[in-house]
Amino acid sequence: MHTSAHSGGLLASILNRAGPLKALNALNGDRVETGKIYVAPPNRHMLVEDSRFRVIGGPRENRHRPAIDPTFRSAAIAYGKRVIGVVLTGALDDGTSGSMVIRASGGTIIIQDPNTALFPSMPENALRMVPEALVATVPKFPSSLPNW
């Protein structure tokens, strides 16, 4: 979710009300832990290196910071085929190049059915470039996840 630099990190609190997994803004140096949802803090990209988060300013991508493409690319490098990238509703093409990198490294991409997206261009663009991605409505995402 692209947020304002002054949003105060609302996404984590929204996600905490939506389900059982704990969501939090990643802090620079935090270890990646299973069972948690990590969100890029406002105005920062979130990268993964050596099982830790790197939270940086960096240039805007797809006119946004944070953007998901830097996260997807770094996760693909760090975890290869163990990465699951999820592209949800949104504008422009953020998530597309990162999805391509995840697939090239053997990872899995799940894309929200564009017909159910409030803003379909992100899922449409990702699906155009990664046609073998799994497509599902948001309620069906859990059953789309590979069993590891």
Over which residues does each language-model region extend?
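Conserved acid/base catalytic micro-environments in cytosolic active-site loops
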Residues: M1-W148
